[in-house]
Amino acid sequence: MNALDIINLSKSFGAQTALDSINLSVPTGSRTVIVGPSGSGKTTLLRMIAGFEFPDAGSLMLNGQTLVDRTHAVPAYQRQIGYVPQDGALFPHMTVADNIGFGLAETGSARAERIQALMDNVALNADMATRWPHELSGGQQQRVSLARALAQRPRLMLLDEPFSALDTGLRGAMRKMVARLLEEAGVTTILVTHDQGEALSFADQLAVMRDGRLVQSGHPMDLYRYPNDEQTAHFLGDAVVMPARIEAGWAHCDLGRVMVNSNGFAGAAQIMLRPEQLQLSDIPADPDGCHAVVTDRDFGGNVCTLTVELRTQASPGRSLLVRSSGMHAPPAGSAVQLSILGAAHVFATP
């Protein structure tokens, strides 16, 4: 069952098309991430769902109830949708407790107990209840904002790049905490971000937007491994893309003979490999295969990103990105042999 159905949703601002016939279903209890570059339309779509903007065409349905269509629109405050903005947007003149309790129907001891339970859920100490927003760290402010949104028992939670202002180390921990909390609460969630790593990590369902259009959606692992086009491939992570001729399930390319994931296609095509699919080894005494030289090593601790230059007759001098364990990454100048882990992805022909 779907919690949210987005049907042919379109929106323009003057001559600029912000959303172009968006169709997307969000399963109940899932975490859907809408990812795309700046100007792709992802924030406009989130604002449509929240009720802050209204579409020119199309409709939205939440748990079978129409939120907006050509004839009417449910006001934002009646949609039972929680919203956590990028900066938390706490009320500066209210304490933590009053921010969380804003709008609660409960009064007296019931209200205090509800606020304390919400603080416990987001790992805020009881002594923070009387603090002011300016006395909190960025991570603490986001926890308060999340607790305030959960206080209304929303049917859907919207997260608008809530981790982008946090330090790198805190960002990952906060993301995991939020994912766990929302899953335990059974709240369907939509996160908007431009951070590819965050999107892949958080999502059950990933939706990629570009120029106001939804270009691909599905499980994040499927989109990473089998993107629809080269632009999507590069947006979701580093990619090695090259021309090839496909015959009987194999690609003949600059790397030699490479297995592909499309047995039904033959002819000229573009293939894609992720850098982690390229494996390096020492050249054997009787060399045979695809050889290269390491020209650059970017040490990243547990993982190194290497640039290697091919030494093949077909494409001498071509540079490729390779990922290797930081423990065994060869230094610049090393002669290596390349092998392929798994199959290359063949882009669909236009």
From Swiss-Prot:
One of its GO terms (cellular component) is ATP-binding cassette (ABC) transporter complex. Keywords: ATP-binding, Cell inner membrane, Cell membrane, Ion transport, Iron, Iron transport, Membrane, Nucleotide-binding, Translocase, Transport. Gene3D superfamilies: 2.40.50.450, P-loop containing nucleotide triphosphate hydrolases. Belongs to the ABC transporter superfamily. Fe(3+) ion importer (TC 3.A.1.10) family. The keyword Transport applies. PROSITE patterns: ABC_TRANSPORTER_1, ABC_TRANSPORTER_2, FBPC. The keyword DNA repair does not apply. Pfam families: ABC_tran (PF00005), TOBE_2 (PF08402). Part of the ABC transporter complex FbpABC involved in Fe(3+) ions import. Responsible for energy coupling to the transport system. This is Fe(3+) ions import ATP-binding protein FbpC. It is a peripheral membrane protein. Residues 4-236 form the ABC transporter domain. It is an enzyme of class 7 (translocase).
